[in-house]
């Protein structure tokens, strides 16, 4: 009886984990498409991305609902509890990233600005952070998690460089707003990393000194 219940819990967790990874991969791909639409002034793609945001984020609600059912029905403990918590937090952060992407797509429609290479680099860094976080979640891989968190420093550096060269916000148009949204996406990936670190090492580390000694080296 208990083995059957345990197998059912494992199956449900595995399925919702797979769905979260697919959702994350789709979000990562949308980061690239959205920033590309902004750089190229591609209004058609930008509109398509905005119009599909709600449908894409339905996945977040399904994942969260399934995790709540798992927590309520199975009352998992230890690693299973941490996994369900990590999956739910990841889905929430991915939803927020997709909302930020819709704002960037809106800027693509409003008008094209001079776009320095920093924006493309920031976009790729966010995608790398998401992909590494998903790999860490899927495989309990601390090295991928370290790489994801370290990339946040690169993201901040790129933002700071851009801010330094665009001090006059009145002349930078939507450029700094796009950069801020990309930096905020990095914040949300760090939120994922926080919970995934808890899954792997059994400690909340992002806002703790352990974070700097374990993940940022």
From Swiss-Prot:
GO terms for cellular component: cytoplasm. The keyword Cytoplasm applies. GO terms for molecular function: protein homodimerization activity. It is found in: Cytoplasm. The keyword ATP-binding does not apply. Gene3D superfamilies: Phosphate transport system protein phou homolog 2, domain 2 (1.20.58.220). InterPro entries: P_transport_PhoU, PhoU-like_sf, PhoU_dom. Coiled coil: none annotated. Keywords: Cytoplasm, Phosphate transport, Transport. GO terms for biological process: intracellular phosphate ion homeostasis; negative regulation of phosphate metabolic process; negative regulation of phosphate transmembrane transport; phosphate ion transport. Pfam families: PhoU. Plays a role in the regulation of phosphate uptake. Homodimer. PANTHER family: PHOSPHATE-SPECIFIC TRANSPORT SYSTEM ACCESSORY PROTEIN PHOU. Belongs to the PhoU family. This is Phosphate-specific transport system accessory protein PhoU homolog 2. It comes from Methanothermobacter thermautotrophicus (strain ATCC 29096 / DSM 1053 / JCM 10044 / NBRC 100330 / Delta H) (Methanobacterium thermoautotrophicum). The lineage of its organism: Archaea, Methanobacteriati, Methanobacteriota, Methanomada group, Methanobacteria.
């Amino acid at each position: 009886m208990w083995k059957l219940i345990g197998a059912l819990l494992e199956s449900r967790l595995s399925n919702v984990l797979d769905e979260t990874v697919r959702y994350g991969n789709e979000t990562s791909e949308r980061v690239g498409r959205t920033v590309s639409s902004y750089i190229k002034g591609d209004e058609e793609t930008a509109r398509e991305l905005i119009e599909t945001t709600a449908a894409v984020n339905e996945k977040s609600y399904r994942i969260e609902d399934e995790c709540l059912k798992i927590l309520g029905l199975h009352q998992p403990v230890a690693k299973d509890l941490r996994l369900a918590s990590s999956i739910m937090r990841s889905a929430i952060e991915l939803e927020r990233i997709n909302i930020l992407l819709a704002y960037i797509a809106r800027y693509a429609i409003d008008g094209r600005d001079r776009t320095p290479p920093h924006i493309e680099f920031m976009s790729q860094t966010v995608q790398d952070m998401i992909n590494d976080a998903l790999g860490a979640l899927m495989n309990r891989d601390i090295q991928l998690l370290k790489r994801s968190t370290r990339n946040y420093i690169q993201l901040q550096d790129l933002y700071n460089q851009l801010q330094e060269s665009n001090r006059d916000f009145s002349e930078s148009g939507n450029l700094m707003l796009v950069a801020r949204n990309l930096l905020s996406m990095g914040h949300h990936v760090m939120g994922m990393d926080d919970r995934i670190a808890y899954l792997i090492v059994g400690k909340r580390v992002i806002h703790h000194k352990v974070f700097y000694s374990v993940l940022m080296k």
